[in-house]
Amino acid sequence: MIRKAEFKDVSGIMQVAKDAHQKSLSRSVPLDAKTLRNNLQVCVLSAEHFVLVVELDGNIEGAFIGVTHQLWYSRKKQATDLFFYVTDKGTGWGAKMMRRFISWAKENRGVGEIMLGIGSGIGDPGRTRKLYERMGAIKIGDNFILPEE
């Protein structure tokens, strides 16, 4: 089931984030558990953040973190995804989490645009792109990373 994250979920979200990090193109950047925990606690408690978890059989098998921030050129805000990942056991729940985020962003006062990204290098970016397009998103560019040599 998908539900809004609670403070007690931080450790479970950390495990999901660690799993995602190991599969990402950024895996050479050391993950600092204390920093991750502190930032997740802020996200779960902040009204500017939207954190969902996929809970199956008592375990966190996916997480979504969205945030709003003021656009640098406007008084309007942008809602964007910071983290979006489901484990193999959580497969199939991603679209529902994304729909919940989009609904939250549209209901969030002052949001002028919703930005969705595909930037981790995990999984099939084409599949994620198709999901976003089915939800009405328009592709506007690409992301690049210079991996550590």
Language model regions located:
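A conserved beta-strand-loop-helix scaffold within acyl/acetyltransferase catalytic domains
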Residues: 28-50, 56, 64-74
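A short, internal acetyl-CoA/4′-phosphopantetheine-binding micro-motif in the GNAT/acyltransferase core
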Residues: 82-92
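A short beta-loop-alpha structural element at the N-terminal edge
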Residues: 1-15
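Helix-loop element at the rim of GNAT/NAT acetyltransferase active sites that forms part
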Residues: 15-29
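C-terminal "cap" of GNAT-fold acetyltransferases
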Residues: 128-149
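A conserved beta-turn-beta hairpin within the catalytic core of GNAT-like acetyltransferases
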Residues: 70-81, 140
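Conserved beta-strand-loop-alpha-helix junction that forms the acyl-donor binding cleft
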Residues: 114-128, 147-148
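Conserved acyl-CoA
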Residues: 96-113
